[in-house]
Amino acid sequence: MDIGPYVLQLFSGLSRAMVLFLLSAGLSLIFGVMNILNFAHATLWLLSGYITFSIFQFLGEQFGASPWLLLPAILSATSLMALIGFALERFLIRRTYDRELPEQLLLTFALVLIVGDLIKLIWGVENRRINLGVEPVEMLDTLINPYHFVIVGSGVAVAAGLWFFLHRTRFGKIVRAAVYNRNMVSALGIRIPIIYALVFAAGVALAGFAGGVFLPLLPMALGVDHDVIVQCFAVVVIGGFGSMLGTFVASIIVGVVYSFSILFWPDGALAMIFLIVIVVLIWRPWGLFGTELRY
């Protein structure tokens, strides 16, 4: 029995899972703390991919082509996306806190259209991808792109960093408290608007990091963010809103199931994800690791 294709799909699924985690972690954090469903989250991820591409190209022209230039390109794009996220919260999102959910969704959907047209204006409609020129390695009867290990390692490192931040730092504990009772946090004299701005910036920064990490694996293209945001919402629903552990576990489930579904049933890959969502909602409507009630 040739296990090569299964090994390849496993690594592909784990890589997809880590990208989904990086994206969904920011989405879950924003919703858990701010109660905002950011429909433009994946579009900001797409924007970060294009920004990373441009920075990588610029650095290559200045210092010569090298795969190591990807790191400063990703970090620069992530920092820029954090600033963009801070500005979006300050001037747009903040005005929707007392509005109904449909109005919030309309605003973030408008951002999808605006950012999409901005990408088309600056970068055109061509696909963008970074070719690192790294040779594949042979493993278990198949050739594996070693960049899969980079993506998986990055995802695990960010997950560990988020856990440490949320459980071992004062600001992280404030963020966790705001998930369950933001009124009590405000009563303690903590300025909630600043918490919101920093959380939104951090969530967009995670999406930005995911966009840069994803770029050497598959090309960025206009419209791909629409499929990705659906998978992100599925991850957050399965794992439970506001739960980082749930987001991590659900990302692995969705990524691996989607990858193997492409191998066995390509047309039904997305349907398999929705089937998992339906089963989880019937069994645990608040998600695998979510809380049943919010006070």
Residue ranges and their predicted role:
Residues 1-23, 51, 62-72, 100-105, ...:
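Membrane-interfacial amphipathic/re-entrant helices at transmembrane-helix boundaries
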Residues 2-19, 165-170, 196-239, 258-270:
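Inter-helical junctions in multi-pass inner-membrane proteins, predominant
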Residues 19-27, 40-60, 206-214, 227-239, ...:
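Hydrophobic alpha-helical segments within and immediately flanking transmembrane helices
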Residues 63-111, 118, 249-254, 284-285:
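Alpha-helical transmembrane segments within multi-pass membrane transporters and channels
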Residues 95-96, 101-168, 195-198, 220, ...:
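Transmembrane helix-bundle core of multi-pass membrane transporters
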Residues 143-220, 244-249:
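Helix-loop-helix "hairpin" substructures at the membrane interface of multi-pass membrane proteins
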